[in-house]
A protein has these predicted regions:
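Glycine-/small-residue-enriched transmembrane alpha-helix faces in small-molecule transporters
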Residues: 1-34, 137-166, 187-191, 297-299
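Hydrophobic alpha-helical transmembrane segments of multi-pass membrane transport proteins
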Residues: 10-18, 22, 62-83, 129, ...
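Hydrophobic/aromatic residues within transmembrane alpha-helices
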Residues: 26, 35, 79, 106-108, ...
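Hydrophobic alpha-helical transmembrane segments of multi-pass integral membrane proteins
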Residues: 4, 34-47, 63, 119-122, ...
């Protein structure tokens, strides 16, 4: 991965890491499924009138939108509703990186080398350290945990659909894919919110919406979705999944740090240790081969 693309990947990590703080603020005055529906509605409109529809098979477009946009967030919100704490949920969700690597190996025949396996194993251990520390002393319902894993698997499936789309003969512009696929989850989210929250709650949240919620929606729609998924999709189309997917493991690290800075949540020593393990594993996985070549040249 080039240095420029590495910087872009880290930008996405920071944007998505801040997501959890923004979501927490946005949910103060709005039901989660409705917030998600409005998020994707802002992504799609009015941009859809100015961006051409991606020329890819409809089944791939539907698969992408239903997995990475609807299923991921529907499973995640239901998991939290069934007792999964938000903090640990953000960590367990990063299992998507490993699901993506496995699915990429089966779908595209991508091969992993020893250095990549070692780096991924180290990063996995770091995530387990973070999860163990976050779950310590908290009762987590197994259903909530399994639903969070389902959300992670949905994200991974979306990554595979993204790579298939970007490898198609009529490769679309990434922004076109992000905007048009945002149409797909809007109605499912609003219907789910209507069933779970009721029309009175939905109407009340719209009537009483404040500037904080509006700014949260703008960040989630324009920064986290259009910019974040736009860059992420470009990188997945350019590199092997094992180079890109593990970078998302840095998201909970940024999430923990931003929560400590912005929400005054303290970072424990074990969380810091887990974050260091993840960053070391990612460095080996993504830049290990380049570092090895550089050493040979210098030698």
């Amino acid at each position: 991965m080039s240095r420029k693309d590495g910087v872009l990947a880290l930008l996405v990590v920071v944007v998505w890491g801040l997501n959890f703080v923004v979501i927490k603020v946005g949910l103060h005055n709005m039901p989660p499924l409705m917030l998600a529906g409005l998020r994707f509605m802002l992504v799609a409109f009015p941009a859809i009138f100015f961006v051409a529809r991606p020329k890819v098979p409809l089944n791939l477009l539907l698969g992408y939108g239903l997995t990475i946009s609807f299923a991921q967030f529907a499973f995640l919100f239901c998991a939290i509703n069934f007792g999964m704490p938000a903090g640990p949920a953000s960590l367990v969700l990063q299992a998507q990186a490993f699901f993506t690597i496995v699915l990429g190996a089966f779908t595209f025949g991508e091969r992993l080398h020893g250095k990549q396996l070692a780096g991924i194993a180290l990063a996995i251990f770091g995530v387990l350290v973070l999860i163990e520390d976050s779950l310590n002393g908290q009762h987590v319902a197994m259903l909530g945990f399994m639903l969070t894993l389902a959300a992670a698997f949905s994200w991974a499936c979306g990554n595979i659909f993204n790579k298939k789309i970007m490898s198609h003969a009529t490769r679309p512009a990434v922004m076109s894919l992000v905007i048009w696929s945002a149409l797909i989850p809007i109605i499912p989210f609003f219907v789910a919110s209507l069933i779970l929250d009721g029309s009175a709650t939905m109407i009340h949240s719209l009537v009483t919406i404040d500037m904080t919620t509006i700014l949260s929606l703008m960040y989630l729609a324009f920064v986290a979705t259009i910019v974040g998924y736009g860059i992420w999709g470009t990188l997945l189309g350019r590199y092997e999944t094992w180079r890109v997917a593990p970078l998302s493991l840095l998201v909970p690290v940024v999430g923990l740090a931003s929560a400590a800075l912005l929400l005054d949540e303290r970072l424990t020593g074990l969380q810091f240790f887990g974050a260091v393990l993840i960053m070391t594993g990612l460095y080996i996985n993504v830049f290990g081969l380049r570092w090895r070549k550089a050493v040979k040249v210098r030698g």
